[in-house]
Amino acid sequence: MASAVFEGTSLVNMFVRGCWVNGIRRLIVSRRGDEEEFFEIRTEWSDRSVLYLHRSFADLGRLCKRLRDAFPEDRSELARTPLRQGLLAIKGAHDIETRLNEVEKLLETVISMPCKYSRSEVVLTFFERSPLDQVLKNDNVHKIQPSFQSPVKISEIMRSNGFCLANTETIVIDHSIPNGKDQLLDADSTEHLFENGGEFTSELEDGDDPEAYVTNLSYYHLVPFETDILD
C-alpha cells in the first residue's frame, strides 16, 4: 500500500493552524492495476506558510495508531477521542463529498487536540511535506512511471463552492502490460486501517500470488524524482 508519510520532522517549534481537504487524486501504483487514493490537503502553519499535502486512507490510520503507540499511558484518553469513529466514517462514506468532509473533520480533530498530542513529533511528521507531495505538486506523471513500468493515471476530483468537479484525466499507457483478467483487480485500500494488519485488514484472496504485487509507491522510490524536479 502506498504511503506518503516518512519518519522524522524538521518542523520543530511549529504547529498546524488549520487544514482543508481540497480533493482526491487516484494513482495506479502497480502493474496489476492497484489504485491508491490520495486526499489533497491544504495546511496552514503557525508561521503562516501553506503546504499542500497528499495522504492516503492508510496514512490516516497509521497516524491514529502511532499516536496511541507514542502515548501508551494515555490510551484510555485517546480512546475517548473521535479518531476511530472518524476513520470508520471515512471508510463508510459512499460519495466523494462526504468522504472529503469526513477526512477534514478527522484532521481538524487531530490539530485541535491538546498540544501534547497536536504538536507531537507524530503529528508534525504526518503534516510534513514528502517527496510524493513534491512530485504530485508538479503533476509529473512521467517521473512516477519508471518505477513501475505500468499505466499511470491521475484523475482529480476537486471541490469548488461546495460542488465536486471531475477534471480531465491524464493517462500514460505502457504497452508492455499484458491484456487479460489479471489487470482487473478490485483492490480496496480502505480495508487497511493500520499498518500492522489489524482488525480491519483484509486477507489476500485465495489464489492471489503475493509476489505478483509491485513494490508500493512510497517516498523511498520518489526521492530521486524529487531531486530531478528541483534540478
Swiss-Prot record:
PANTHER family, sorted: PX DOMAIN-CONTAINING PROTEIN 1
Example GO molecular function: phosphatidylinositol binding
Protein name according to UniProt: PX domain-containing protein 1
Coiled coil: none
Any Pfam family the entry gives: PX
Gene name as annotated: Pxdc1
Source organism per UniProt: Mus musculus (Mouse)
Domain PX: 1-134
Gene3D superfamilies recorded: Phox-like domain
